[in-house]
Structure formats: structure tokens, C-alpha cells
Amino acid sequence: MREEFKGKTALVTGGSRGLGEALCRRFAAAGCRVIVNYAHGKEAAQAVADAVGGEAIQCDISSEEAVQKMFDRVGPVDILVNNARVDPYKRTPEMSDGAWWDAVMGVNLKGAYLCGKYALEGMKARRWGRLLHISSLWAYQPANERMLSYAAAKSAMHALSRGFANLGAPYGVTSNVLAPGLILTDMVSSRLTPEMLQKEMAGIPLGRGSSPAEVADFAFDIVRTGFLTGEIINLNGGAFMAP
């Protein structure tokens, strides 16, 4: 398995903590050179990069100029994992509805598009590549006010991935979506009381959330599969059962 991916470059956006960190560790374990992208939190990103023998690169992926510079610096990217997101709970009181919409869409959708676009160009030239986009259970659920822009961005990501799948297929490039449910990250643990967490898990048929490592393992399995493209794969313990 290490030989299969040895020397390939994997770029993980939002790679400094939580699921992003687990993804970086999983691809490094497979022999990849790992690029840990981050917007904020240099120390955390550098710690992950040091742990996996990779490189931490700061980039606001909502800026096309910044994304282009990042890809110029990194060189050929074989595997892109679009994991970065704007946290729906980080909205500040002074932000207008329009400003918040732009902030969420800028990272969660535009950023995924820009990174996918620049990655795909090189992948097509080398006739091999993997695009994986991390979505959410919220892409399927009727959103409340807090989650409206987040849910819309994640749902649109599904169409974006199918477009990339169509464009990349003649060149051996695949594009898929992984839509996890509840992931038991440190952020989730700090935000939910034990009672709230128990209530969340009670609504999941399998009765639990997933660990970041469990999701990262499954993400790697998707990337390994060269005959899978244009698909949306759910990993949520039965919280949403696709028809």
C-alpha cells in the first residue's frame, strides 16, 4: 500500500486539526508527501506538518490569487482533499447576513472550486489524480437559520464534484464526495455538553458518532479506488439513508 502512494503529493485544505489532521496523518501513513493547508493557527498546522513529515502552507482559499500562488509553490498535486470550511458557529454579531453568506460560500464552495480547478489542470496533464470533497449531513437536512449558508454550500459541492468527475474522467482523474455525519472532534466535545452529545447520538441508528481517524480511513479507501467517480458517499451511522 505504501508503494502505491509513495511519492505522491496530497494537499489537505483545513488540515491543522480535527478531521483535517486525521486526513493528513492517514495519507502520510500511506507514503504521501502531505501539504497541510491552513488559514489561521500556524502553530497547530506546523505541529501536524512536523508529525507527518510534511509542509504547512497558509492560504486563504477564497482568493484565487492566493490559491494560484499555493499551487505554484507546492508543485504537482496528485491528491486534493477539499476539507476546509467556515465554522457555522463562528459568526460574529456584527456580520450582516450578506457578509456571512459570502464568507461561508467563499471558503466552503468557491475555495473548493478554486483548489479543484488548479489541481485538476496538473492532474489532467499527468493523466492521474484524485479529488475528494468533504461534505456534511447538512447537505440533506432542512437547515435552520444558523446552518442555512453552510448547508447550501455543501449541497452545491455535490454538483461541483460531479462536474469535476465529468471533466477529469478522460484523463484518469476521479472526483467524489464524502459526507460524514457526527464526528467526535475536540471542537464538538468542547461545544456540546454530555447531555447534548447523548441526544445527538440517540438520533443516529448505530448510536454513536465516528472518530476523525475512522472517517480518514474511509476517505483513503475512496481515494484508492480508481474506478469510483462522480459519487456521493455517506458515512453517518444511518442518520441519513440515501435511496
PLM region descriptions:
Residues 9, 16-17:
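Conserved glycine-rich cofactor-binding loop
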Residues 42, 58-69, 98, 213:
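The beta1-alpha1 cofactor-binding region of Rossmann-like NAD(H)/NADP(H)-dependent oxidoreductases
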Residues 85-102, 145-149, 189-192:
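Conserved mid-core segment of classical short-chain dehydrogenase/reductases
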Residues 86, 97-114, 128, 132, ...:
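Catalytic Tyr-X3-Lys loop
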Residues 87, 132-156, 161-170, 182:
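Catalytic loop of short-chain dehydrogenase/reductase
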Residues 107-128, 165-166, 170, 220:
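Amphipathic alpha-helical dimer-interface segment in Rossmann-like NAD(P)H-dependent oxidoreductases
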Residues 128, 211-235, 240:
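C-terminal substrate-recognition "lid" of short-chain dehydrogenase/reductases
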Residues 140, 179-190:
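Short, flexible catalytic-loop segment of classical short-chain dehydrogenase/reductase
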